[in-house]
Curated annotation (Swiss-Prot):
Subunit structure: Homodimer.
Pfam families: HGTP_anticodon, tRNA-synt_2b, tRNA_edit
GO biological process, one term: prolyl-tRNA aminoacylation
CDD domains, per the entry: ProRS-INS, ProRS_anticodon_short, ProRS_core_prok
Domain text: Consists of three domains: the N-terminal catalytic domain, the editing domain and the C-terminal anticodon-binding domain.
Cellular compartment(s): Cytoplasm
Source organism of the structure: Pseudomonas fluorescens (strain ATCC BAA-477 / NRRL B-23932 / Pf-5)
A molecular-function term among this protein's GO annotations: proline-tRNA ligase activity
Database matches in SUPFAM superfamilies: Class II aaRS ABD-related, Class II aaRS and biotin synthetases, YbaK/ProRS associated domain
Keyword annotations from UniProtKB, A to Z: Aminoacyl-tRNA synthetase, ATP-binding, Cytoplasm, Ligase, Nucleotide-binding, Protein biosynthesis
Function: Catalyzes the attachment of proline to tRNA(Pro) in a two-step reaction: proline is first activated by ATP to form Pro-AMP and then transferred to the acceptor end of tRNA(Pro). As ProRS can inadvertently accommodate and process non-cognate amino acids such as alanine and cysteine, to avoid such errors it has two additional distinct editing activities against alanine. One activity is designated as 'pretransfer' editing and involves the tRNA(Pro)-independent hydrolysis of activated Ala-AMP.
Family label: Belongs to the class-II aminoacyl-tRNA synthetase family. ProS type 1 subfamily.
Name recorded for this polypeptide: Proline--tRNA ligase
Name of the gene this protein is made from: proS
Lineage: Bacteria, Pseudomonadati, Pseudomonadota, Gammaproteobacteria, Pseudomonadales
HAMAP family noted in UniProt: Pro_tRNA_synth_type1 (MF_01569)
């Protein structure tokens, strides 16, 4: 491809509304253009990259035995009402009526549509297992679209759905899809980690997220330095570093603590180690009008997913208001504790192992110090309530935990029968009786992968694409292309490279565009390999080669360029 025949839409300045680096570079490299909030047009340069992601995803899905379909992006309300999600789904579901007054939505996901298809097409266990996938536009009406393609309203997604007669069959396909996802991200040249994840409201027996590692990632992912254990922060089990509770060394005492409403103030005023403090958090119970106390150590953070999964706790988690606290306990949030607390109590595992600690006295401006379990109050219900921190023991007993930032680009679920049961998706089983199908769900954010790859691979000059993802593998930059010698050598090499199957962008812009601008544009776009053709080089029988990841260029004999690139470029 020649730049004279291409839409080369690079920009020198960074748009003011672009915050994250992927958004900035995709705009500057001429990959996308904003249409409206959360809506983007893919320009030729960007679309070439996305099509490469799609191709690899498609190849791995086909290799895993999945069959491609294409479902409508517009979905009738009746299916969502049947599954119960029409009422459950929030304002992210864009709803509208057609000219006949019938309700529809713009599909953010396709569980209902695929389940309807399966119940109409499948009748016998002999047709199972079946795994169907599509690559389709999705729409979620995000309240605050931001970060370009990282959190837009319209996006491209690969979603697959599998159907099974039993859990054992689902597990086989789930494992196969897990491997297929690992294959996809490996082939894309990305540093990634699959991590255990919480199923949340979807339910089911298993769930994994796939994260591209990047400092700009929105998610914390946890992994062991001594094993393959990995999970997201919501799912990771917090194992206490302590193995036993020290014996009491202090007497229980009631202390006046005026103007001490926070853990930080308590630590500073009374020289109390933060590890000897607790946070008492009061939340709504499942039973209307009731409250439950959740207690974690002062230096730990409550994991709201774990907390909401506790028996009796309302989900999603709702914190009690100050009025509710005063009505139920008689004190404000900064003075609460488990001693004489008239509520059910759940404490974190690390709290159970504390001794001689400080707590609120359930009286404003008063705390108890020197508190000890069993001596001063009974040990209540114990559960895993907190987020892990770096250095915690790995739950599998091998090594300690490290935490990195990641961008979620894929998620696989074992759905169980959540949708098939609600929508009566059944087949006749081997015994001739109806069987409700088990389902799996497997998603990859195709357009999000493009942005995540840039977040992981960039420098001060622009994007750094892998050979697999780059819009073009080679930038061919002639200096003084208008001269006969340079033009003939450039055109000859261009023909040889394209005939060899390479994707080449020949920068044939005229002499008004300086070499510096040409080089800067190619680096901004992120083309992995650059060949420069010049009078001086040709006079010496050489061309100049530079890798996008290397600082220095090198001279190559003209006759060796093709073989050099064939050996170097991963295809």
């Amino acid at each position: 491809m020649r730049t004279s025949q291409y839409l080369l839409a690079t920009q020198k300045e960074t748009p003011s509304d672009a915050v994250v680096i992927s958004h900035q570079l995709m705009l500057r490299a001429g990959m996308i253009r904003k249409l409206a909030s959360g809506l983007y047009t893919w320009l030729p340069m960007g679309l070439r990259v996305m099509r490469k992601v799609e191709a690899i995803v498609r190849e791995e899905m086909n290799a895993a035995g999945a069959l491609e379909v294409l479902m409508p992006s517009t979905q009738p309300a009746e299916l969502w009402q049947e599954s119960g999600r029409w009422e459950e789904y929030g304002p992210e579901l864009l709803r509208f009526k057609d000219r006949h007054g019938r309700d529809f939505c713009a599909g953010p996901t396709h569980e209902e549509v695929i389940t309807d298809l399966a119940r109409n097409e499948l009748s016998s266990y002999k047709q199972l297992p079946l795994n169907l996938y599509q690559i389709q536009t999705k729409f979620r009406d995000e309240i605050r679209p931001r970060f370009g393609l990282m959190r837009g309203r319209e996006f491209i997604m690969k979603d697959a759905y599998s159907f099974h007669a039993d859990q054992a069959s689902l597990q086989v396909t789930y494992d196969r899809m897990h491997q297929a996802y690992c294959n996809v991200f490996t082939r894309l040249g990305l540093k990634f980690r699959p991590v255990e994840a919480d199923n949340g409201s979807i339910g089911g027996a298993g769930s994994h997220e796939f994260h591209v590692l990047a400092e700009s990632g929105e998610d914390d992912i946890v992994f062991s330095n001594g094993s393959d254990y990995a999970a997201n922060i919501e799912k990771a089990e917090a194992v206490p570093r302590e193995t036993s509770r020290p014996a009491p060394a202090e007497e229980l005492r009631l202390v006046d603590t005026p103007d001490t409403k926070t853990i930080a103030a308590l630590v500073e005023k009374f020289n109390l180690p933060i590890e000897k403090t607790i946070k008492t958090l009061i939340v709504h119970a499942e039973e209307p009008g009731k409250l439950i106390a959740l207690i974690i150590r002062g230096d730990h953070e409550l994991n709201e997913i774990k907390a909401a999964n506790q028996p009796g706790v309302a989900s999603p988690l709702v914190m009690a208001s100050d009025a509710e606290l005063r009505d139920a306990i008689g004190a404000g949030a900064g003075s609460l504790g488990p001693l004489n607390l008239p509520l059910p109590i759940i404490i974190d595992r690390s709290v159970e192992l504390m001794s001689d600690f400080g707590i609120g006295a359930n009286i404003d401006d008063k705390h108890y110090f020197g508190v000890n379990w069993e001596r001063d109050l009974p040990v209540p219900t114990v559960a895993d309530l907190r987020n892990v921190v770096a250095g915690d023991p790995s739950p599998d007993g091998k090594g300690t935990l490290e935490i990195k930032r990641g961008i979620e680009v894929g998620h696989i679920f074992q759905l169980g029968n959540k949708y098939s049961k609600a929508m009566k998706c059944e087949v006749l089983g081997e015994n001739g009786k109806p069987v409700t199908l088990e389902m799996g769900c497997y998603g990859i954010g195709v357009s999000r992968v493009v942005a995540a790859a840039i977040e992981q691979n960039n420098d001060a000059n622009g994007i750094i694409w892998s050979d697999t993802l780059a819009p073009f593998q080679i930038a061919l930059v002639p200096l003084r292309y208008e001269t006969e010698q340079v033009r003939e050598a450039t055109d000859k090499l261009y023909s040889e490279l394209t005939a060899a199957g390479f994707e080449v962008l020949l920068d044939d812009r005229d002499k008004k565009t300086s070499p510096g601008i040409k080089f800067a544009d190619m680096e901004l776009i992120g083309i992995p390999h650059r060949i420069v053709v010049s009078d001086r080089g040709l006079a010496e029988g050489n061309l100049e080669y530079k890798s996008r990841t290397e600082a220095e260029a090198q001279a190559l004999p003209v006759a060796d360029v093709l073989s050099f690139l064939q050996a170097r470029i991963r295809r």
